[in-house]
Amino acid sequence: MSNYKYLFIFLVIAFSFEPAFGVSSFSADEKENIQIYEKSSRAVVNISNIAVNYDFFYRAMPAETGSGTGFIIDKSGIIVTNYHVVENASKLVVTLADNSQWPGKLVGADPNNDLAIVRIKAPADSYDILEFSHSNNIVVGQKVLALGNPFGLRQTLTTGIISALGRTIAAKNGRKIEGIIQTDAAINPGNSGGPLLDSEGKVIGINTAIIGSAGSVGIGFAVPSNTALRILPDLLKYGYVRRPWLGIEPIPTVYLRRIGIDVPDGLLIARVVKGASADQAGLRGASRTVKVGRYQVPWGGDIITHINKIPVTTMEDLAQQIETRKAGEEITIHYIRNDRVLSVTVELVLRPRS
């Protein structure tokens, strides 16, 4: 009988220590994942995009056209997400981690970088916030974590590494987004707008599901945090990004060479907008058109070859050199006019809102 008594005591002691043994069985990496999830998940929200259509009798017929993810960065209820998550919304509904729902107001949007800002008026104690880290410090191979709502499955965590840096993808409006982060962390439809976190739980990117919309194929993409940090002040203050421009209509000379015209690499200026940066700097557009085969080609304009000594041969090259700067900044443009290589300093001015 005493043997049964000792066995019972042993089993009680063993089971009483089981939770402790279970906790200690987590690896250091697993513990880090758990800590980051617990620290970050209350800052991640689901955003439902509601469109309102009307029937024959003009009765409103709201319908959810899609959903995505966002994350809160400020106790005033500021949410960062993708532009394509909120595009064309008649109504936005934001669901917090505690399942409470709040109307969202679109504060600002930048289709060119697929980013948008939404605000909610919810009690500050009903959510947490995330902090940004500078994406210029990240390296290929480092661990990353993605939080979001893939396929409507809320509060989902996936992990991976940074697979590559400096990728270029197309935004929904066709513009190229430069400097994209590539990761093997699973990013699926519904993850759009969610945070890509480093091992400290700080945001280094904004996940996007633009590419591979049919589902994850082991390649995910994120807009770098430095892009968001650069444009957020404008989105919050003006609702859009105030970008500088040259005020030219350029033609990549590669197209001219395809029809048999011998011209150097660069951008031929077809037209200069009066009063814009290029006009003020004295750059010239085409003075006439010439017929080449069945084509009418603008001719006689300056050919831009470099900006700040960096070759410029495509529209994407030009956008990268201009739109990442601020109005008032100066750039040096190298160009060819009448077979002479010249340069000029140009002060950038704001692109007109229209």
Model-derived segments and spans:
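Bacterial N-terminal signal peptides that target proteins for export
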Residues: 1-8
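Bacterial N-terminal signal peptides
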Residues: 8-19
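Conserved PDZ fold ligand-binding element
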Residues: 79-80, 280-315
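Nucleotide-binding motor/catalytic cores of P-loop/tubulin-like NTPases across gene-expression machines
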Residues: 273-276, 305
